[in-house]
Amino acid sequence: MDINNAKISLIHDWFIRESLGGAEEVTFLLDKLISENYSEPDLFALTENISEEQFEIFSERKINTSLIQILPFGKEKVQRYLPLIPFAIEQLDLREYDLIISSSHIAAKGVLTSPDQLHISYIHTPMRYAWDQMNTYIERSSLKNSVLEIPLRYLLYKLRSWDFISGHRPDYLIANSQFTSKRIKKYWRLDSKVIHPPVNIKRFSYNSEREDFYLSVNRLVPNKRVDLIIKAFNTLKLPLVIVGDGPEKNKLKKIANSNIIFYGKGTNYNVEKLLSKCRAFVYAGIEDFGIAPVEAMASGAPVIGLGKGGLLDTVNCYTQPKKNKISTGILFKK
């Protein structure tokens, strides 16, 4: 393949303005790198509803979407159509492309390609709620202990089979961390190359003078486990700032004591400044990689986090002093 003359497509699962996170940041950067070094890729996703400001990242190019885009609430609530996702991603027509690059945490890896096309997939995670996080997902849903729990379990069982099959479709798999690579090996029985996501650490500056507050930056969704952080700080009575938005925000505000404040939409804050001033950065989620903790360390803030997942790739935690090595955080076991 002549890469300089290749026609390229870039596929991500979806772009939902309320839940843009690390996977979307990686996709934006992939688009930038491909556009600067080769030709602008055509963009595909199951659905999109990004804002005009976010749309400028893609130089106002069209994002080709699936049939879910035209269904009621498909743009905003794509996961309501979970049973349709495998079917929908397979309907994207990529026949005219030489190189397909997918950025996948659920479905993008599952696009259909021909033997003469090259498909490289950057895997953020195998489908979480089809594998090791299935029971957690069900417990946090409104369907636990209802008549619909069994149909939900059957759906996840079928999705697990599709996730395994579709994981074998790309020609090359790239994992975002050792943790993700191990999950790919366990669930798909495949090898993968680990390339950590790029993090723009130039945005952040080290500051040795710290103020008396702790910081957590997350999308406020169940798997980030911000509720555990709140419960801990309710007990400790230490000042905590939580930055983020998401469907869990009102629920989390209700359980937070007065020592905890929230910054998000409608509030004036600067993440870079908060990271440069906080005493430490607190993170409770089991991350596939975890961009926010890397940004915190770039600002000189030590990380207090769970010793599982992607944090094991990035946080140096030494219980005993080591020559020429410094700790960048504390990782707790559970």
Language-model regions, residue ranges each:
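Active-site donor-binding segments of glycosyltransferases and PAPS-dependent sulfotransferases
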Residues: E36-K109
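Membrane-proximal helix-turn-helix segments that form the acceptor-binding/catalytic region
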Residues: R140-L173, S181
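Acidic anion/phosphate-binding donor-loop and adjacent secondary structure
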Residues: K182, K186, L190-V194, P198-D212
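Conserved donor-binding/catalytic core segment of Leloir-type glycosyltransferases
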Residues: V199, S205-V241
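Nucleotide-activated donor-binding/catalytic signature segment of Leloir-type glycosyltransferases, i.e.
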Residues: N250-E272
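Acidic donor-binding loop of glycosyltransferase active sites
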Residues: S276-D288, A301-P302
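Short hydrophobic beta-strand element within catalytic cores of glycosyltransferases
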Residues: P302-L306, L312-V315
